[in-house]
Amino acid sequence: MQEDPLVLIGKMTAKLNERALAVKTAEDWYDGNHPIPDPPPNTPAATDGEARKAYLTMSRLAVTNFLRPIVDVRQRRLNPEGFQFSQSPTSTDTGVWDIYRRNHLDGDSDLAHMAALKTGQGFVIVWPGSDGKAEITIEDPESVIVAYEPGSRRKRKAALKRWVDDDGYVYVTLYTALAIYKYRSAASTTTGLYVAGQSGGSYQLEPRQVPNETWPLRNPYGEVPVFELRANPSVKPSLYGGGTPEFAGVLNEQRKINQTTMLMLVAMEHQSFRQRWVTGWDYPTNEDGTPDKASMVKAGASRLMTLKPYDGQEDKLRVGEFSQADFRPFVDITQMLVTTMCSSSGTPPYAFLLGNLINVASDAMARLEGIQADALEALSWHFGETWSDAMRFALMVEGNEKAKDPVITTVWGEFERRTATEQANLAMMAKAAGAPSTVVFSMFPGVSPSEAKRWKTEAISDQLVAAAAAPAIDVTPDPVPPVPASAG
């Protein structure tokens, strides 16, 4: 028996509020908007307003974001290149790929992967468009959440999408396997007229009528049309899904890097300019005998220092300077922390442009690439399953019998970076081993499955044209010599 939609919306809205806060926090970390720690106690910045302002300014300058490359280097390598069915496991299907490209997913899939890698989850909604064909959209993880059946990580119970439209009203859509319920807040968010305690949270919901649609809208497919891409999911089933950002395990290292940079900036502020000292100097004083700081000699690049020694002690006047601070330890500590981030996150060091990768042996670089390829392969298992389910639903929407295929596999591009020569050699080896021509063609960089099939068709056409233009082969048999008459 299906749960009351408003009760279900109330539960899912509360979880979506928690999820939206976590998503916003993860996106801030990725964007470099890191939380600023409070000033240490017993320091002027903890009590004095001006000192606190200076501390906050310096802390914002100290943010040195090393989290972005962890996500970017993975996202750039995750490129779906087609889908295979159990009936044709050696080639990709052009029909489902046409649906994929018609929905601009050859570009927009990057948005879903980026959202999942940054925040732990991304979402895809599939539903018929106005023309009856499958329409696939990428959704913001702050606005969508999926509820799963208890004990399952795959059986979707319901999904919720919430957003504020241009008119200021809150819109909520509940997706279930039987129907789709569309609501709108009774008041605009710009009026502040909310009713606390309602299922929608701080606003009252009322059914939203859409022209030429029944309410609720029947779901003829018997399946929730919202699909979740989860990055690094837990083995424990979660009622509301979700994953873990790629950089979640190295946030402490990022905090340490920011703190190290902060200390370096403070040292630069106070010790980068060489401090000078003077002995035997008759410094100016006030009437009470205290040093006259206003008349003191001030050091500067455009200033000439003129000093008056004590009477009769001219030979004791000395001027010197302290050595400037050594900032190399700060750089070394930062590099050590970044190396720790590489190890913990499985990100190759070259993603951070570390200087110790100069003249790295090819075997060592291959091992670094292997770490990256393993991480990408693990992500592709989770993401690929979601894309396969979404495309199966799209085929169902369009009445394609291939939706009944029990095995739909997402085909990914190469996870390892190879030179064009290496890739061409690999393709030639595959050809020598008897691989189909479409597989050989698709191994060349930048060649999509549809392009590979076009190459195959043109290659066959060229062979036929060449055969037709070739001179005719004379198939007239050689004359048979006469049999000599037998003697006698």
Segments the model singles out, each with a brief description of its role:
Residues 341, 387, 440-441:
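Hydrophobic, well-ordered secondary-structure elements that form the walls
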Residues 112-115, 127-128, 268-277, 351-356, ...:
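Short coil/turn segments at secondary-structure boundaries
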Residues 117-119, 123-244:
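Extended, regular secondary-structure scaffolds
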Residues 283, 369-387, 393-394, 463-488:
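Long, compositionally biased
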Residues 207-367, 407-415:
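Extended, charged amphipathic alpha-helical segments
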Residues 385, 398-435:
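Extended amphipathic alpha-helical segments with heptad-repeat/coiled-coil character used for oligomerization
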Residues 444-475:
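Long, highly charged low-complexity segments enriched in Glu/Asp and Lys/Arg with interspersed Ser/Thr
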Residues 1-155, 161, 166, 293, ...:
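Extended, helix-rich architectural segments
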